[in-house]
Swiss-Prot record:
Main location: host cell
PTM field: Phosphorylated by host CK2. This phosphorylation is necessary for interaction with host BRCP and degradation of CD4, but not for enhancement of virion budding.
Lineage, uppermost ranks: Viruses, Riboviria, Pararnavirae, Artverviricota, Revtraviricetes
Description of how activity is regulated: Ion channel activity is inhibited by hexamethylene amiloride in vitro.
Protein source organism: Simian immunodeficiency virus (isolate CPZ GAB1) (SIV-cpz)
Name listed for the protein in its UniProt record: Protein Vpu
Cytoplasmic side: 24-88
Entry text on domains: The N-terminus and transmembrane domains are required for self-oligomerization and proper virion budding, whereas the cytoplasmic domain is required for CD4 degradation. The cytoplasmic domain is composed of 2 amphipathic alpha helix that form a U-shape.
């Protein structure tokens, strides 16, 4: 009987450990996905702004620049780069 209780406790512990590991993996993957999505959006906006700057007849109203600054600020904050000298 004691052996059975011990085996059940070990099994419960292994299941709990497995849940913790999978939770960490899912959390890490989600953070990586968010960072990739943010980097892609920054690159896309930067490309749009460069193309618009090269095309002299097409001026922006500043919304993309503000959005790009906000995305870069969020990217730096999320990656623990908090240097006030580089604040936009």
């Amino acid at each position: 009987m004691t052996l059975l209780v011990g085996l059940v406790l070990i099994l419960v512990g292994l299941i709990a450990w497995n849940i913790c590991i999978w939770g960490y993996i899912i959390k890490w993957g989600y953070r990586r996905y968010k960072r990739h999505r943010l980097e892609t959006e920054i690159e896309r906006l930067n490309l749009i702004l460069r193309e618009r700057a090269e095309d002299s007849g097409n001026e922006s109203n500043g919304e993309e620049e503000e959005r790009l600054e906000q995305l870069i600020h969020n990217y730096n904050h999320n990656n623990h780069f908090a240097n006030p000298m580089f604040d936009l």
